[in-house]
Swiss-Prot record:
PTM info: Activated by phosphorylation.
GO CC annotation, single: cytosol
Residues that coordinate or bind Mg(2+): 102, 241, 243, 245
Cofactor(s) the protein requires to work: Mg(2+)
Enzyme class of the recorded protein, top EC level: isomerase
The species this protein was found in: Leptothrix cholodnii (strain ATCC 51168 / LMG 8142 / SP-6)
Gene expressing this chain: glmM
Functional description taken from the UniProt entry: Catalyzes the conversion of glucosamine-6-phosphate to glucosamine-1-phosphate.
Residues modified to Phosphoserine: 102
UniProt protein name: Phosphoglucosamine mutase
Keyword rRNA-binding: no
The reaction(s) this protein catalyses: alpha-D-glucosamine 1-phosphate = D-glucosamine 6-phosphate
EC number(s) reported in the record: 5.4.2.10
Disulfide pattern: none
Length: 444
């Protein structure tokens, strides 16, 4: 049975359009509360949010719904998604909730949940909540209505947690670091983490106004960080997204490092420290050069479906620690239960510090294969899997590339698009092959 409201990362959509409306979120809060009351005598739920103006409205509706079901609520105000996961676990709470649409612009918002262990919840739990949404409400007796209070020291608690993932024997003294918080949830915590570890911090994307989240700044618009690093003569730049669960880095030369490269650095550092790394998990989109480089070092590499949720599932099933996506969602499960942009940046900077080499030097010999990605718009009702011309072209190109490249064709999960990606050692060849596939997809 498919889910009606939940997607791959909670519930998300345009504000004012179902399901991101105050009335639905009230019902959602009540439904979640009823589910929790089935397993907890007096549940306590932590609610965090990013800096979107709609967060105030949705927070109030969610709080009211939970209270109406007899659930107590703790409010953190703007706080990164991974901070909510951490605090839910650290404070032994029943559930953590984040109101955020991550890297999207302010017009969108969403709601996602973490278990008492700070982990994303199962499909079965989400189905149970959806059933409760459709059922008639069961209001609590007046004496059993939940209470709400603010957790005023939430930012400070999270800053200390982030710092604890960085070696006590190291510091960032002598480094100038530009921190770009995307005008999002980490605007008031990310700069403090790097500053308290000794770095000279320059802030950009740290002035949210409710409307400017992810607007020309952050991990989805890294050029702003590249320019700021150069302008300030900084050693490194750190770009987070709106809820700070992903990160990209920039060095003093303006070179941008994506999640694939940062994952390799994290794995290589563990190996250099003599720590066992049996394997790492990427996605179908992870650059082939990273896979080859890791295998040459004796590290098994497995590809999951696109999405940090699937990377996490694969890591847990195999008992591994490190994984990630090119977008900057990185997982180090011995440090945190979920992807954390700040913690991931610290792991990379720690590798740079204790190896005495720049990030570029740590990536020496790992040259990313050129990738060409084309989005092909599909006609209504068009089934790309029945396109014989596309199938023949895909086989032909696969034979041409051999072990020096690969082809990936997959549908978008949100739009009527077919994503065609070709990876090859030669950029011109990747482009030519991708164009051939796109034409076949459109005309087949």
């Amino acid at each position: 049975m498919s889910r009606k409201y939940f997607g791959t990362d909670g519930i998300r959509g345009e504000v004012g359009t179902s399901p991101i409306t105050p009335d639905f979120v009230l019902r959602l809060g009540h439904a979640v509360g009823r589910v929790l009351r089935g397993t907890h005598d007096r549940p306590v739920v932590l609610i965090g949010k990013d800096t979107r103006i709609s967060g105030y409205m949705l927070e109030s509706a969610l709080e009211a719904g939970l209270n109406s079901a007899g659930v107590d609520v703790m409010l953190t105000g703007p706080l990164p998604t991974p901070a909510v996961a951490y605090l839910t676990r650290a404070l032994r709470l029943s559930l953590g909730v984040v109101i955020s649409a991550s890297h999207n612009h302010f017009m969108d918002n969403g709601i996602k949940f973490f278990s008492a262990r700070g982990e994303k919840l199962s499909d079965a739990w989400e189905m149970e909540v959806e059933a409760a949404i459709e059922a008639p409400p069961q209001w609590s007796d007046s004496s059993q209505i939940g209470r709400a209070r603010r957790l005023h020291d939430a930012p400070g608690r999270y800053v200390e947690f982030c710092k604890s993932t960085f070696s006590n024997e190291l510091s960032l003294k002598g480094l100038k670091i530009v921190v770009d918080a995307a005008n999002g949830a980490a605007y008031h915590v990310a700069p403090d983490v790097f500053h308290e570890l000794g770095a000279d911090v320059v802030r950009i994307g740290c002035e949210p106004d409710g409307l400017n989240i992810n607007d020309g700044v952050g991990a989805t618009s890294p050029q702003a960080l590249v320019e700021a690093v150069r302008m300030n003569g900084a050693d490194y730049g750190v770009a987070l997204d709106g809820d700070a669960d992903r990160v990209l880095l920039v060095d003093r030369n303006g070179r941008l490092y994506n999640g694939d490269e940062l994952l390799y650095v994290m794995v290589a550092d563990r190996l250099a420290q003599g720590e066992p790394v049996p394997g790492a998990v990427g996605t179908l989109m992870t650059n082939m050069a990273v896979e080859v480089a890791l295998q040459q070092r004796g590290v098994e590499f497995v590809r999951a479906k696109v999405g940090d949720r699937y990377v996490l599932e694969e890591l847990v099933s195999r008992g591994w620690q490190l994984g990630g996506e090119g977008s900057g969602h990185l997982l180090a499960l011995d440090k945190h239960t979920t992807g954390d942009g700040i913690v991931s940046a610290l792991q990379v900077l720690q590798a740079q510090q204790r190896n005495g080499r720049s990030i570029a030097e740590l990536l020496d010999g790992v040259e990313l294969f050129p990738q060409t990605l084309i989005n092909v718009r599909l006609a209504a009702g068009q089934d790309w899997k029945l396109n014989d011309r596309l199938a023949r072209e895909r086989i032909a190109i696969g034979n041409e590339l051999g072990q020096s490249g690969r082809v990936l064709i997959r549908p978008s999960g949100t739009e009527p698009l077919l994503r065609v990606m070709v990876e090859a050692r030669d950029a011109a060849q990747a482009r030519l092959c991708a164009d051939r596939l796109a034409v076949a997809a459109q005309e087949g």
